[in-house]
Curated annotation (Swiss-Prot):
ADP binds at residues 12, 16, 265, 308, 409, 413. It holds the Pfam family FGGY_C. This is Glycerol kinase. The gene is glpK. Sn-glycerol 3-phosphate binds at residues 12, 82-83, 134, 243. It comes from Chromohalobacter salexigens (strain ATCC BAA-138 / DSM 3043 / CIP 106854 / NCIMB 13768 / 1H11).
Length: 501
């Protein structure tokens, strides 16, 4: 009798393996961090072998620590850091270069040349995305142009491209499966989200040979079986989704207007828009939420590059505290209107500003400012940025979110969650199970494997641990937010992005 689903959650700084039971409860967790490589300013890389080995080890560790046998596991769901780009040899499976991570900004000049040439409207109309180094297409083009012999080998059909899910699937299946799902494909800037196919015009624009590309499947599908020697048996791989879409599924945001926000290294707010690919007038992204039985559900997304990374910087860079758990007590020492604003534009600004040249700053310092105020300002920045996204979504979509479901490491901080509810002016729901990204991948696998009849059954499993109700006066909320907007304007790099909301 199958008791568990194994979820592989391959993230930006660590790989995790989690076993879930049929009720969506966590039975066991294993996690392993891996090295980050910064070979030049603005460049971020991962060693693909580090990713692969960390995934294998965590899967084996969680089975060992829980005592789960291979016979008790129904199958595998997989979720991954999106956009991160790999290129490997089809014969050997060996990568030609380190993975270029979603945070990497090396293709900024090329992206600007595409914008200057007037391509952004065309690209957005096909992909729902903007021209930015964030997405996979320009990273893949860089690999083809800069790895010796790569373009020639690609033209001969010797190489394979994939995001992290595709690379792991290739490895797990012994090279038998070169595939991805529609959510990951929708983040490459090469996939037409309306036709649900790789787009020939985009491939031509970015100079990408079609022979490199994986097959695109539903998010719940037959992705093959793992080679028995990896985990002890030929487990079926039955669900794949990019991390933020997987979290949307894990939070059971299945109706149009339902929204979730994940607070990890970055912050990602996604609202379900149903069968309609809503176009943002505020520079948010239109993306695939999930594709099931050939039917596509769309979402609108705002991506904030720095959320939990601010806490890491305050801890490791400024050494203001020893452990992230100390931040709540520090923040509680401050008065509400302390006047300090921290804009964490360490790698530029994401949605809705999309200003890669912006840089971080702290405003409002006085002789009274201490560690507590700076820490509080860093935490509040995440909430202000979420308010930025909320304002855009409310303007773009009729069925806007009347409440927000949250997950990720930062949501365990009650002070942050209360300030978030106050700043948004809507209830904020924190679920009982915070491993929503991995849970979403497990649910997708469970649908394919017959564990769950439909999305309604999965929605019935969601449980709320605590709701944070807004309690701040409207006038105070708006006063604080105006201060944030002023700080944002001050860090923007170019006249073009100043005044853009």
């Amino acid at each position: 009798m199958h008791s568990y689903l194994l979820s592989i959650d391959q993230g930006t700084t660590s790989s995790r393996a989690i076993l879930f039971d049929r009720q969506g409860r966590v039975a066991g967790v294993a996690q392993e961090e891996f090295a980050q490589h910064f070979p030049a300013s603005g460049w971020v890389e991962h060693d693909a072998e580090d990713i692969w080995q960390s995934v294998l080890r965590t899967c084996r560790q969680v089975m060992e620590s829980t005592g789960a046998s291979i016979e008790e596991i129904a199958g595998i769901g997989m979720t991954n850091q999106r956009e991160t780009t790999l290129l490997w040899d089809r014969r050997t499976g060996e990568p030609l270069h380190r993975a270029i991570v979603w945070q990497d900004r090396r293709t900024g000049a090329y992206c600007q040349s595409l914008i200057d040439a007037g391509h952004e409207a065309f690209i957005q109309s096909r992909t729902g995305l903007l021209i930015d180094p964030y997405f996979s297409a320009t990273k893949l083009r860089w690999l083809l142009e800069n790895v010796p012999g790569a373009r020639e080998r690609a033209e001969r059909g010797e190489l394979a491209f994939g995001t992290v899910d595709t690379f792991l699937l290739w490895r797990l299946t012994g090279g038998r499966e070169h595939a991805t799902d529609a959510t990951n494909a929708s983040r490459t800037c090469l996939f037409n989200i309306h036709t649900q196919q790789w787009d020939e015009a985009l491939l031509s624009l970015f100079e990408i040979p079609a022979s490199l590309l994986p097959e695109v499947k539903d998010s719940s599908a037959d992705f093959g079986r793992a080679e028995p020697h990896w985990l002890g048996g030929p487990l079926p791989i039955a669900g794949i989704a990019g991390d933020q879409q997987a979290a949307l599924v894990g939070q059971t945001c299945f109706a149009p207007g339902m929204a979730k926000s994940t607070y990890g290294t970055g912050c990602f707010m996604i609202i379900n828009t149903g069968e309609k690919a809503e176009v943002s007038h505020n520079r948010l992204l239109t993306t695939v939420a999930y594709r099931l039985n050939g039917k596509t559900t769309y979402a609108m997304e705002g991506s904030i590059f720095v959320a939990g990374a601010t806490v890491q910087w305050l801890r490791d860079g400024l050494k203001l505290f020893a452990d992230a758990s100390e931040t709540e007590a520090l923040a509680r020492q401050t008065r509400a209107g302390h006047g300090v604003y921290l804009v964490p534009a360490f790698t530029g600004l994401g949605a809705p500003h999309w200003d890669p040249g912006a840089r971080g700053a702290i405003f409002g310092l006085t002789r009274d400012t201490g560690i507590a105020e700076i820490v509080a300002a860093g935490l509040q920045a995440v909430c202000y940025q979420t308010r930025d996204l909320q304002a855009c979504m409310d303007d773009d979509i009729e069925a806007s979110a009347g409440r927000l479901r949250v997950d990720g490491g930062m949501v365990s901080n009650n002070w942050v969650m209360q300030f978030l509810a106050d700043m948004l002016g809507v209830p904020v729901d924190r679920p009982t199970v915070l491993e929503t990204t991995a849970l979403g991948a497990a649910y997708l696998a469970g649908l394919q494997l017959g564990w769950y009849a439909d999305l309604d059954e999965i929605a019935g499993l969601w449980r709320c641990e605590r709701t944070f109700e807004p309690s701040m006066e409207e006038a105070e909320r708006e006063r604080l937010y105006r201060g944030w907007l002023d700080a944002i304007e001050r860090v923007k790099c170019s006249a073009e992005t100043r005044g853009r909301a």
